[in-house]
């Protein structure tokens, strides 16, 4: 079954996450995703316009800092959520202790 452009774009991003520093050539992306060069070129162009990938001086493709920064945003959110939950647990524990007395 053929994948949609969105599915191919996400597959490219996932693939390039494993090659953040060195990137991959178009031909290698096509081979690994078993997609035609036409589709991959189209998808890479869209990802480039969206600032998710960029071309290296040697012609390969790498992720920009954007998707990596989004991952960092998620990690910061998780940390803040954990801190809030820890604070909430401490407050409810203290209130429960007062109720027991």
Protein language model annotation of sequence segments:
Residues 69-73:
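Short, charged/polar, Gly/Pro-enriched secondary-structure boundary elements
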Residues 4-68:
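N-terminal helix-turn-helix
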Residues 76-101:
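Amphipathic alpha-helical dimerization/coiled-coil segments
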């Amino acid at each position: 079954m053929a994948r949609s452009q969105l599915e191919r774009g996400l597959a490219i991003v996932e693939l390039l996450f494993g090659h953040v520093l060195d990137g991959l050539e178009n031909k290698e992306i096509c081979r690994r995703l078993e997609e035609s060069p036409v589709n991959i070129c189209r998808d890479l162009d869209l990802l480039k316009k969206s600032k998710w990938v960029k071309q290296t001086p040697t012609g390969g493709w790498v992720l920009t800092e954007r998707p990596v920064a989004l991952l960092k945003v998620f990690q910061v959110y998780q940390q803040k959520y954990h801190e809030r939950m820890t604070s909430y647990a401490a407050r409810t524990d203290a209130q429960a202790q007062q109720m027991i007395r």
